[in-house]
Curated annotation (Swiss-Prot):
PANTHER family tied to this protein: PTERIN-4-ALPHA-CARBINOLAMINE DEHYDRATASE, PTERIN-4-ALPHA-CARBINOLAMINE DEHYDRATASE 2
Name of the protein: Pterin-4-alpha-carbinolamine dehydratase 2
Catalytic activity: (4aS,6R)-4a-hydroxy-L-erythro-5,6,7,8-tetrahydrobiopterin = (6R)-L-erythro-6,7-dihydrobiopterin + H2O
InterPro entries: PCD_sf (IPR036428), Pterin_deHydtase (IPR001533)
Pfam family, one: Pterin_4a
EC number annotated for this UniProt entry: 4.2.1.96
Modified residues (N6-acetyllysine): 120, 124, 131
Subunit structure: Homotetramer. Interacts with DYRK1B.
SUPFAM superfamilies in the cross-refs: PCD-like
Keyword list, A-Z: Acetylation, Lyase, Tetrahydrobiopterin biosynthesis
HAMAP family assigned to the protein according to its UniProt record, in alphabetical order: Pterin_4_alpha
């Protein structure tokens, strides 16, 4: 466990390490501090929230509880500008996408790793991502 923590500290950097280690030491406290946005979507919430995302081109991944979409832009600069906007919002939300970029394409997967599945945070970030993409 100590070796894993040392590797994680090196991976996340010194600035984020304190928060990460504090959460590791007291998992109950960090779970208690989570907002209602950080809980799995209920069946009713899925029925209400996911169809709108699917209509916008998002798909549910069958191999894990996550949503995915690929965006295409005019060029790399536009794709990178989009990623920068999303990154700033994700940092504000403390909720970070899995993404991959090659030239003008950006592939995004959203899931809440701390909950092990889709949450309202994922839906809110996906909705922001849609607005950011539409504004370019």
């Amino acid at each position: 466990m100590v070796a894993a923590a040392a590797v994680a500290v090196a991976a996340v950097g010194a600035r984020s390490a304190g928060r990460w280690l504090a959460a590791l030491r007291s998992p109950g406290a960090s779970r208690a501090a989570m907002s209602s946005d950080a809980q799995w979507l209920t069946a009713e919430e899925r029925d209400q929230l996911i169809p709108g995302l699917k209509a916008a081109g998002w798909s549910e991944l069958s191999e894990r509880d996550a949503i995915y979409k690929e965006f295409s832009f005019k060029n790399f600069n536009q794709a990178f500008g989009f990623m920068s906007r999303v990154a700033l919002q994700a940092e504000k939300m403390n909720h970070h996408p899995e993404w991959f970029n090659v030239y003008n394409k950006v592939q995004i997967t959203l899931t809440s790793h701390d909950c092990g599945g889709l949450t309202k945070r994922d839906v809110k970030l996906a909705q922001f991502i849609e607005k950011a993409a539409a504004s370019l």
